[in-house]
């Protein structure tokens, strides 16, 4: 396992798209002097950065634009929610202070939606497992 930072980057020339990038060290979060430069908008630290990349890919695989540049078609609040709602242990290190209340509200709403969906899916699979365990016990007892 390799510790690292997962960060989200946006670019004014690519609205509605986000890049998920990784580094071993904390990325530079100073705002770009040129408004046409990419900007870091969110940083999280993971104890297993490769697993974090895999989880992002699994969550947003339908929105992947370019695997080489790690570019996805997603809003910034949705992209941040993908990271925040993941069950992997992580720590939010930095959040762009220029984010508005509306974007933060959308992120929180998306986090709740993703966590509820994951919880419901877990319950479904636990129910399926219990059903098959019960059928196995009935089969062993010769009742089924």
Where are these regions (language model features)?
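Non-catalytic accessory segments flanking enzymatic or RNA/DNA-binding domains
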Residues: 1-17, 23-144
């Amino acid at each position: 396992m390799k510790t690292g930072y997962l960060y989200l980057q946006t670019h004014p020339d690519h609205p509605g798209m986000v890049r998920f990038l990784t580094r071993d060290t904390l990325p530079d979060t100073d705002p770009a002097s040129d408004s046409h430069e990419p900007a870091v908008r969110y940083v999280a630290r993971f104890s297993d950065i490769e697993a974090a990349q895999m989880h992002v890919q699994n969550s947003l695989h339908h929105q992947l634009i370019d695997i080489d540049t790690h570019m996805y078609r997603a809003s910034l609040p949705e992209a941040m929610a993908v990271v925040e709602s993941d069950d992997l242990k992580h720590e939010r290190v930095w959040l762009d202070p220029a984010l508005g209340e509306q974007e933060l509200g959308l992120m929180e709403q998306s986090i709740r939606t993703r966590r509820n969906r994951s919880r419901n899916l877990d319950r479904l699979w636990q129910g399926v497992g219990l059903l098959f365990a019960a059928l196995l016990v009935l089969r062993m007892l010769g009742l089924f």
